[in-house]
Amino acid sequence: ADRVLVALGRRPNSRDLGLESVGVLLENGAVRTDCHMRTNVPGIYAVGDVNGKSMLAHTAYREAEVAVHTILGQKDTMSYRAIPSVLYTIPELSSVGLTEEEAKAQGLDVAVVRIPMAYSGRYVAENENGDGIFKLVIDKKLRTVVGAQALANYSSEFIAVVGVFIELAVPIDLIKKQVFPHPTVAEIIREAACQFA
């Protein structure tokens, strides 16, 4: 084999926290929270891996912000719709939003655009052969991006841009009109959007 990927799962660790003794609800070991990071017990919040949601450091950071804002009486909610996920391999594997399979399972009629990373001149210049692929998952009815995946070096540096488009439900036609600096690897996003009719 040329490449081997070993993946270990994660699970929340809520043992020995005494949560059951105060009545905090757990689901498969995860602390149940609402979109404000509140548990069912007033004054108790749960962020990070313990709530079993996204289980990524950058998600935990945002969940903590939401919890603090809620505690301070400021309006804020947590959305998991466009949390980027990255495997820091060579090349990197990045994803945000829904995969094609997840979108179809939700009953969405989707189009998929796959383009080689060679569409980005800078990517080709900085990566021998320009190997890699970028994929957009597009809701055909709403004409918005619902997901993206990339197998490409430094895809972690541009995948969050797609996350913003997903979170704000930016129409694909506006993405096509967005001007990206040239030469950048992030141009691949617009290039893929332009492949959708």
Where are the predicted features?
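Small-molecule pocket liners
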Residues: 29, 84-85, 134
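Hydrophobic pocket-lining residues within nucleotide cofactor-binding pockets
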Residues: 24, 50, 83, 117, ...
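Internal hydrophobic alpha-helix adjacent to the cofactor/substrate pocket in enzyme cavities
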Residues: 58-81, 108-110, 167-172
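FAD-site-proximal beta/loop scaffold in flavoenzymes
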Residues: 3-72
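Solvent-exposed alpha-helices and their adjacent loops that cap or buttress functional pockets
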Residues: 38-39, 43, 79-80, 126-128
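Flexible, acidic loop-helix segments that line cofactor/substrate-binding pockets
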Residues: 76-92
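Flexible, glycine-rich terminal cap/loop adjacent to redox cofactors
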Residues: 72, 88-197
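Short beta-strand-initiation
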Residues: 4, 82, 131-133
